[in-house]
Amino acid sequence: MKTIKRIMAALICMTIALTGIPISVKAADSSGTLDTNMETNSELFITLEENTDYRWNVNDSGEKGSDVHLDTGEGGNCRFRLDKIENGWYGIKHIKVNGTDRFADVKDESKDSGAKIHVWESNDEKVKGKEHRQFAFYYLGNDANGNKRYYIKNRKSGRWLGYSGNLNNNNPNIIQTEEKDRKVWLVTKSVVPLTGKETQILK
């Protein structure tokens, strides 16, 4: 029986290799699928699905130690890019206009639920060996308007990204949290996600 199972597994792998079907890794504790082909080296925006007026933004002037929070602003402090590290893990780098770009990480390398996400390191070489600066994106499918939906997970802590407290126009901090409190994020190339009204404008 074990021999038959090994043969079947080998045949499946050969079929995938020959047909070019990408191998995606399922997360045991996630309803999403680990995305190993996130877009890199492009300006991206990370928006809260439950209220798309809110997107990731970096406090103040985006200097070392500035917190990442939710904001309705559409200015320069909400631009990010992804740098591929390995095996589905990415660095999330804040793009600072006329300043220093810095990677998001978990403050104090904490594994605790509720720990803040802030920006710190600017050197690309100092991300690969630092798991608190590495994040995975679990694809949940597109929304009705074609925006890609994700859960985001930190490598070191194994916790998910959400926000502290309530929205209520108070620009809450991005934090790592328990699975039950994780949020769905839209990752887009436009500051405002697709709304479905674009086709009406074209008409």
Residue ranges, per PLM feature:
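Extracellular glycan-recognition/adhesion modules and their associated mucin-like linkers
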Residues: 28-63, 79-111, 128-167, 186-203
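C-terminal segment of classical bacterial N-terminal signal peptides
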Residues: 17-26
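Residues in well-ordered beta-strands of folded domains
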Residues: 17, 69, 93, 118-120, ...
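Gram-negative bacterial Sec-dependent N-terminal signal peptides
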Residues: 10-18
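Bacterial N-terminal signal peptides that target proteins for export
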Residues: 1-11
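Short, tandemly repeated low-complexity microdomains enriched for cysteine and small residues
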Residues: 61-76, 109-125, 131, 164-181
